[in-house]
Regions:
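Bacterial N-terminal signal peptides that target proteins for export
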Residues: 2-13
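Surface-exposed patches in mature extracellular/periplasmic domains of secreted proteins
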Residues: 87-95, 168-173, 238, 523-527
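Acidic, contiguous N-terminal accessory segments
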Residues: 26-137
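Catalytic-core regions of glycoside hydrolase
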Residues: 90, 112, 209-211, 247, ...
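Catalytic domains of carbohydrate-active enzymes that cleave complex glycans
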Residues: 450-733
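Acidic helix-start/capping segments at beta-turn-to-alpha-helix junctions
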Residues: 92-110, 171-172, 177, 530-534, ...
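Feature activates predominantly on carbohydrate-active enzymes
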Residues: 62-77, 81-83, 117-314, 344, ...
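Bacterial N-terminal signal peptides
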Residues: 12-22
Length: 733
């Protein structure tokens, strides 16, 4: 009896050790999987219910109708996801044999066509999908149907998301399609792999190894984007190197395009307007010159031979030193249309950025893009999209919506958002930007009466455009977790979800990401979701409250610098924007100042132009406000300003306590990383508070209000802080 017992204990010990090791491996998290964590569902009863509802994957699509690679990606995702979430293999079969079969296909499948209506198929459109619980001949099934292969892939991710979120699927009934056609990431990546305003390592694109070696991470990148419905990527910096258009580099671009194509992603390139001179041996880039026109046409032909589904060109022209058509006495429309003509035969588009301002123009910088582009409305060709930042300055923590939205009804406008945190603490500070983007998308321009939201302009529905686009400047790099801060991938996720459907609530998006990235533990979900949803406003409070803007340190844009007044351009100086003096604070953009308000529709201009009706959040953007002005709270503007700075600091401290309480509820690797980052964020929030309140106090001459902590150091201490090699800055190249 002793020997068998000993053997049995050895077996049990080995099994126990294996389980412990597996458990430890499962708990080790480096963030690489992002929100696509297909670990077994913790609720065993729910997991078993899902397993009964999803017993096999039925796929028998005619191969002629579909790109084989995308169909294979759909199958592989379902197999991988269901195996991981359910803890069992779910076979792929050609014909349903069990209850709970998952039926996957298109209208070409005669067995599936009767299960949906024409109305559903129209609603699904080109890229959407139908997910539905159905009964076929008395047998319960789950239907995943789409008009095209990419819709099947998007639908597969949507189904797996429902399981990750622990949603019931026994009454599943979902028809979903994107509201915006082109949903792009913009990478500000240089060919030397430096990422301008990047905080998560170097560029993903291994140009020196391409086209021979294609990093498997490109496919993981495509897969993550497909899970959100992002369908395009601009690979390189808007401050473009003309080498990207040489034949050698185009072959490298083609290799990346091949890796991303199965996931529905089209590749775009940022191009330099003067490329015909720099890599084309021409003496001019004048868009009216026939030789220049022929060069761009020939270059487009070359690109499309290599990349048949190439998306088009993104152009930054006549801005911040970049060349453009104005160098030759031409307009933005002249330059964009010349390039657009080269792309028309291939179905490509030109995306022309409206981020323009001129140091020789002494007009308010906030007005300059409107002044340049508004007169050109209706003069761009039909395959030109004007890409407009969310606000009129430059991705500040809070800006009013850009006045061009609603001002160019005959021109498609794309909304450009910044996912990377150039002005919100890089990848050090927690700043979830879903609420910021939702704020601008829901903003009512009143351009065509009430309800003329920025979202309806961007999706083309308000002005009846046949093309629509939204873009996000990526926060992605070679860091193992992709985005630097363990919670920053929530911004990538939020951008993708809002690009697909900007009517989604930010609380829903934050809840989804938290559950998929961490767990469905209610305490974990409540804590992290609350932190995410508070974070943008907290950063606004301790950096630039009440409509203050552009008061950060020079060049690297990290930390406070309201005192800076020595930049070579006036409109690069924080003092240009805050205009603090003995009387008050803020930029007067009313009729008595720069009159930038006149660029907005009358109802908006009227509301924002009156101190009594202007939102507190935009007060100092549009008004020079006396220090002793009484705010809605009853406090003076000075007291309100200082208390906002303090509140931002207090909020970060609350997060620290909340995060500490999660110890043991999430993996140690990510918990420890975030704990360290929150400590630094709290310290730097105090620096912002102390630097800004002391600096503005030199003008107000007023004491800090009760409730605001005294500064730790004198103002000179903060003015003397010099940071070097901040990631994403020119010095760090």
């Amino acid at each position: 009896m002793i020997a068998p017992l000993s053997h049995r204990w050895r077996v049990w010990f080995a099994l126990l050790l294996t389980l412990v090791l597996l458990g430890s491996a499962a708990r080790a998290e480096d963030g690489y999987r992002l929100w696509l964590r297909y670990d077994p569902i913790a609720d065993s009863a729910l997991r078993q219910a899902y397993a009964r509802s999803l017993t096999e994957i039925v796929m028998n699509e005619p191969p002629s109708r579909f790109g084989a690679a995308t169909l294979a990606a759909t199958r592989d995702e379902l197999v991988r996801g269901l195996h991981g979430l359910l803890g069992t293999d779910v076979p792929v079969v050609a014909k349903a044999t069990r209850d709970g079969a998952l039926l996957v296909g298109t209208p070409e499948n005669p067995d599936l066509l009767p299960l949906v209506s024409e109305r559903d198929l129209r609603a699904a459109s080109e890229e959407g999908y139908i997910l539905r619980h159905v009964v076929v001949d008395g047998h319960p099934r789950v239907l995943l149907m789409a008009n095209h292969n990419i819709g099947l892939l998007y639908g597969a991710f949507a189904l797996l998301r429902e399981l990750q979120l622990n949603h019931p699927i026994d009454h599943l009934d979902m028809v979903s399609a994107p509201r915006i056609q082109r949903r792009l990431l913009n990478h500000w990546d240089d060919l030397n792999r430096f990422v301008e305003r990047g905080y998560a390592g170097r560029s993903l694109w291994e140009w020196f190894q391409l086209p021979d070696y294609v990093d498997p991470r490109y496919r993981d990148y495509g897969r993550a984007n497909a899970s959100l419905g992002i369908n395009g990527t601009v690979l390189n910096n808007v401050n473009a190197d003309p080498l990207i258009l040489t034949s050698d580099y185009l072959r490298k671009v083609a290799a990346i395009a091949n890796a991303l194509r199965p996931y529905g992603m089209r590749v775009y390139l940022s191009v330099r307007f003067s490329a015909p001179v720099e890599v084309g041996d021409l003496t001019t880039a004048d868009p009216f010159d026939p030789a220049v026109q022929r060069w761009w046409s020939a270059k487009a032909d070359e690109i499309y031979r290599l990349i048949p589904d190439f998306g088009g060109f993104l152009v930054k022209a006549n801005s911040e030193g970049q060349p453009g058509p104005q160098n030759y006495g031409r307009t933005h429309a002249d330059g964009a249309n010349m390039m657009a003509d080269a792309l028309v035969p291939h179905g490509g588009v030109v995306i022309w950025r409206a981020f323009v301002y001129d140091d020789k123009n002494h007009e308010d910088r906030a007005k300059q893009a409107y002044d340049e582009f508004k007169p050109l409305d209706g003069k761009f060709h039909s395959n030109v999209i004007i890409q407009v930042k969310n606000g009129p300055i430059d991705f500040m923590p809070r800006e009013p919506f850009h006045p061009l939205f609603g001002a160019m009804p005959r021109t498609p406008l794309s909304l450009e958002l910044q996912i990377t945190q150039e002005y919100l603490g890089g990848s050090i500070h927690l700043a979830h930007l879903g609420p910021m983007w939702k704020e601008v998308l829901d903003s009512d321009t009143h351009a065509d009466g009430p309800g003329s939201t920025v979202g309806r302009i961007v999706d083309g529905s308000l002005e009846h455009h046949g093309i629509s686009m939204i873009a996000g400047v990526a926060n992605i790099g070679t860091d193992r977790n992709w985005c630097g801060h363990p919670l920053d991938a929530a911004n990538w996720y939020a951008f993708g979800r809002l690009a697909w459907d900007y009517t989604l609530g930010t609380d829903t998006i934050a809840d989804e990401w938290t559950r998929m990235t961490f767990s469905n533990d209610p305490r974990v979900v409540r804590t992290i979701t609350k932190m995410l949803l508070e974070s943008r406003e907290a950063v606004v409070n301790y950096e630039m409250p009440l409509g203050l803007h552009h008061i950060m340190a020079s060049d690297h844009h990290y930390g406070p610098g309201p005192w800076v007044n020595d930049m070579k351009r006036a409109d690069w100086n924080p003092t240009y924007y805050h205009r603090a003096d003995a009387e008050g604070l803020g930029f007067d953009r009313t009729a008595t100042g720069s009159n930038a308000l006149a660029q907005y529709a009358p109802p908006v201009a009227k509301a924002w132009g009156d101190l009594a009706t202007c939102p507190d959040t935009l007060l100092l953007w549009f008004h020079h406000v006396p220090w002793t002005y009484r705010m809605r709270s009853g406090r003076t503007m000075w007291d309100e300003l200082c208390l906002h700075y303090q509140h931002g600091v207090d909020t970060v401290r609350e997060w620290q306590k909340s995060w500490d309480a999660l110890h043991g509820s999430i993996d140690d690797e990510r918990w420890s990383h975030v704990k360290v980052l929150l400590a630094r964020q709290e310290r730097e929030a105090r620096q912002w508070r102390d630097a800004c309140t002391q600096y503005f106090q030199t003008f107000s001459k007023l004491p800090l209000p009760v409730g605001v902590e005294p500064p730790e150091h004198p103002l000179a201490y903060y003015e003397a802080i010099k940071l070097h090699y901040v990631p994403g800055s020119a010095e760090a190249k």
